[in-house]
């Protein structure tokens, strides 16, 4: 997020600059997306006034405001306080139920199992196994996948 802009400005700037939307249209779309992620009441707040989870949700609203075909998430919860992880995962789960295509790099295995149509398990930067969530989480074929899932899922 741009620290010199409030939440609303962060969600309208790209729309007006890149998509050439007028201010009123950009504001309407931004407010709709901020509402989707539970951040509409923070439109006047600056990023410094928000928690990590709130910043992440504003960033999601900003991205949605650009009408993407695909939304990419690279470890969206890795830098968050553990208490804030749930609010971001809930937001992403709600987006998944809208049919939005998302590519998510995550170590949140329960979340991945619950929302994924397809799962790719990577080991040392190489695809080790891919399939449906059931293929990977219930019937993994590769020893490395089984080992990782056992270690991660039994830890929680």
Regions found by a protein language model. Name each.
Residues 134-156:
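C-terminal boundary and immediately downstream tail of ABC-type ATPase nucleotide-binding domains
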Residues 71-74:
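Catalytic Walker B motif of ABC-type/P-loop ATPase nucleotide-binding domains
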Residues 130-131:
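ABC ATPase "signature
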Residues 12, 23-42:
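Conserved ABC ATPase "signature" region
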């Amino acid at each position: 997020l741009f620290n010199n802009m409030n939440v609303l400005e962060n969600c309208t700037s790209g729309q007006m600059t890149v998509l050439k939307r007028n201010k009123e249209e950009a504001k309407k779309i931004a407010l709709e997306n901020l509402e989707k992620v539970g951040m509409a009441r923070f439109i006047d707040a600056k990023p410094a006034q928000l928690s990590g989870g709130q910043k992440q949700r504003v960033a999601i609203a900003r991205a949605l405001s650009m009408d993407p075909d695909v939304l990419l998430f690279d470890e969206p919860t890795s830098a968050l306080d553990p208490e804030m992880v749930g609010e971001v995962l809930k937001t992403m789960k709600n987006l998944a139920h809208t049919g939005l295509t998302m590519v998510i790099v995550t170590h949140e295995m329960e979340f991945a199992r619950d929302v994924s149509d397809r799962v790719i398990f990577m080991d040392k930067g190489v695809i080790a196994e891919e399939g449906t969530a059931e293929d990977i989480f219930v019937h993994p074929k590769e020893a490395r996948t089984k080992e990782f899932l056992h270690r991660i899922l039994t830890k929680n």
